[in-house]
Amino acid sequence: MAIERTFSMIKPDATRRNLTGAIIAKLEEAGLRVVASKRVWMSRREAEGFYAVHKDRPFFGELVEFMSSGPTVVQVLEGENAIAKNREVMGATNPANADEGTIRKTFALSIGENSVHGSDAPETAAEEIAYWFSGTEIVG
């Protein structure tokens, strides 16, 4: 098994409801370790940059508006197969399709306000981590 790092974000719908600790607890219970974390309130420009891959999708404007509507917690997680493990713990994007006990099934309000974001591949993990963190901010 490979020790790897992944990017994780707790979205504004969850921070507004004070769910940060409960979400981090679920991640840690799954064997993931937080090696970098900070609370940020994204500007529209930061949200547009972070989600640039979706710029041509019909939901892009709504996504940018939501992500810049309140604080988020951006994190780097580390553990065995961290990318797959984080995605498993998060659950399906649509909370209606998420397995019981997952973060999204437990906490998400809707497909748009689904509480968390996580990288889907090693390449996106590296890009997303670099978007928010310098190397000196990641402390294993």
Curated annotation (Swiss-Prot):
Binding site for ATP: 11, 59, 87, 93, 104, 114
Major enzyme class: transferase
GO cellular component terms, semicolon-separated: cytoplasm
Chief location bin: cytoplasm
InterPro entries assigned to the protein according to its UniProt record, in alphabetical order: NDK-like_dom, NDK-like_dom_sf, Nucleoside_diP_kinase, Nucleoside_diP_kinase_AS
Cofactor(s) demanded: Mg(2+)
EC code: 2.7.4.6
Localization in the cell: Cytoplasm
Active site: 117
HAMAP family: NDP_kinase (MF_00451)
Protein name according to UniProt: Nucleoside diphosphate kinase
